[in-house]
Amino acid sequence: MAQYNHAAIEKKWRENWEKNPINVNDGKKEKYYCLDMFPYPSGSGLHVGHWRGYVISDVWSRYQLLKGKYVIHPMGWDAFGLPAENYAIKMGVHPAKSTAANVANIKRQIGEIAAIYDWDMEVNTTDPDFYKWTQWIFVQMFKKGLAYEKEFPINWCPSCKTGLANEEVVNGCCERCGTPVTKKNLRQWMLKITAYADRLLNDLDKLDWPEKVKKMQTEWIGKSYGAEVEFPVEGRDEKITVYTTRPDTLHGATFMVLAPEHKLAKGLATDETREAVEKYIFDASMKSNVDRLQDKEKTGVFTGTYAINPLNGAKVPIWLSDYVLADYGTGAIMCVPAHDDRDFEFAKKFNIPIIQVIAKDGKEIENMTEAYTEASGTMINSGDWNGMESSVLKKEAPVMIEKMGIGRKTVNYKLRDWVFSRQRYWGEPIPIIHCPKCGNVPVPEDQLPLTLPEVDSYQPTGTGESPLAAIDWWVNTTCPCCGGPAKRETNTMPQWAGSSWYFLRYVDSKNDKELVSREKADKYLPVDMYIGGVEHAVLHLLYSRFYTKFLYDIGVVDFDEPFKKLFNQGMITGKNGIKMSKSKGNVVSPDDLVRDYGCDALRMYELFVGPPELDAEWDDRGIEGVSKFLKRFYNLVLDNKDKDVKETKEMLKLRHKLVYDIETRFNQFSLNTVISGFMEYNNKLSELAKKEGGIDKETLRTFVILLAPFAPHLGEELWRELGGTDSVFHATWPECDEEAMKDDEIEIAVQINGKTRGVIMVPAEISKEEAIAAGKEAVKDKLTGTIVKEIYVPRKIVNIVQK
């Protein structure tokens, strides 16, 4: 008998698939779109952690293929943006060259996975034929008022020398390079994602996504209900508007805090406080929002000016503190220290009065040592509101405040508009022309794409200007409206621009007339299953939903959610759970493992290593067990393929149990237990073969079909050995007959007074009377008393109660 030679078998079937593709659209099958989050082509290539997501998506795609679907399973490259440019700078090569080399390397590595990617659909975000449509979307957003320019302090990475969106700042540091983030005043292009806040929030309910991701997006959007209240500034003709979710506590507002960037902040300083106020404003400008919100000791400065509480006329000192952000609410808050931990801490530190306005059972706390933050209680020290329940007043106060003319009921969001420009070279040029007469004018659609000019010096300037600003011949142009001299926008788009819509382009990637034809969009979109890491929960996944809703609104597609189902795979880590990285020296390359054990063994171990949604620690020794299983199954099939064994009832039962167990685990995405299930049933079949003298061909064929999505090369090889003339992937996924799974005989326990005294085998459909009689017969020598009760729990126990 031939030995299992993984190298020869895998080479043979790779070549066969090249000549005879297995996933062909005949126009009759139902489509199934399974998508990976496309990679950005880093210089380090793929390690075994990257393989995991690609293997999961390929196994799922092949399963859909066997279910009779036409599977859309494309791949492409997220190649613009900071990661690619930073790598190019580090290596001292132009990003266009380094990106092309990295794409070629990773494409070779992806080929080793043996995934059924349709490379005819391939896209690359740096291809002008692709980013023509990235720019086209921006132009449409500009025309609809969703893209606008604004100068304001943004997150600034001193190392990457570019602005960052809030989502790109992690623990006060740049997500990409880890440098502490500061603030810089810059002219920026913004996308008005806030216009879609309610739809982005409400439509989460219709998505089959992990609850964790939906919760993260819900919290990021951060919708809250409350009131805006106007506090007059004492001695001035000015008012400060605050946003509060607790207008019921207005009588307890003993001070007010403004963000250091608030437009009135500097002007509120008195002669005595001006120096301290200006220093505080400057110091705050050097901190990132994340730093400012961290749970550490609060800082602040008194402006020397007071506001008037509009409800009771009390003087309220106005402070500045960096824990208030200019871009949340109104950039000013009223502070009720008796009922907010942060305000309480601030008031204690700066000796500000604390007035309790909510009390349990209406009883005031003497000498408060902490804030009373219970959600409900009775109002005290609140004038006409005394005696009301705070939970009721919280809902009624916004309307009451509105009627008094001191504020209005309002809704607020934590979600901010998206900072969409980057001061870098390697990105899509923003298709806007600045004309002194006409203002901002979009590049005419028939002139798209506006291509990125080739330059010698692409390094970031650090001045707040993109390297494109230094290219006079490119910057200087004519206005498409008036024909006068004008200048091009020199900032580029962020790396998220292309990835926010790329999944739409795959199905019509060669179309030079439309982003995607409506015919193909209706036929092949949206995505049925999206697979990738949870780290994209509030970046890419939120942006993609925003883009899709916009494209739905302008009639490009007829759906407003891009991804029906989402699966987030866990990370593969090195020893002790440490993330794999070149710098840590713990990267495991798949190349050697493929050589030594084969692609099929590595694919299966990637899934066997642990539940796919959880992080798992890599251990090379584990692949040996999977490799042994493949050899044993190969030998089992070859040992039995030529035997003329008739199907027995036991074989039939085992076959249908195999189908049931594998499919149930598969559909639960419990892929690690699918692999262990294969191993269990291989052992059962081996034992049955010894007992029966062999295994029937239908059972062997069934096992091969079930295994094929996981070990496609071996699946094809054994399918041919069993007489298959076409690809195993043109077979049909087996169906399970639950009747055939049923046992003829079952084991039940026989108890006396609730204690097990024996076990008997009885027919599965035995009657109560027969079961009790059989049970009594089995323990008759132990029945010494008077029987007072006989109990039969079907298929489980017989219990004889005696005195």
Functional labels for PLM-detected ranges:
Residues T305-L311, K315-Y328, V357, T477-P612:
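Alpha-helical recognition segments enriched in aromatics with Gly/Pro capping
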Residues S57, Y70, H262-D361, E366, ...:
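Catalytic alpha/beta core of large soluble enzyme barrels
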Residues Q3, K11-K12, N16-N20, K90-I240, ...:
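Residue patterns forming the tRNA-binding/recognition surfaces of aminoacyl-tRNA synthetases
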Residues M1-L35, L65-P74, S98-N105, Y280-W319, ...:
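Conserved oxyanion/phosphate-binding beta-strand-loop segments in alpha/beta enzyme cores
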Residues D78, K143-C157, K409-C438, Q495, ...:
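Helix-rich, typically C-terminal accessory recognition domains appended to large enzymatic cores
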Residues I193-T194, R199-K223, A259-V301, D446-T478, ...:
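Amphipathic alpha-helical
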Residues D26-V93, T99, E122-I137, C160, ...:
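N-terminal catalytic cores of NTP/NDP-binding nucleotidyl/phosphoryl-transfer enzymes
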Residues M1-N20, V24-K31, A259-H262, D271-R274, ...:
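Basic, alpha-helical terminal appendages of large translation-related enzymes
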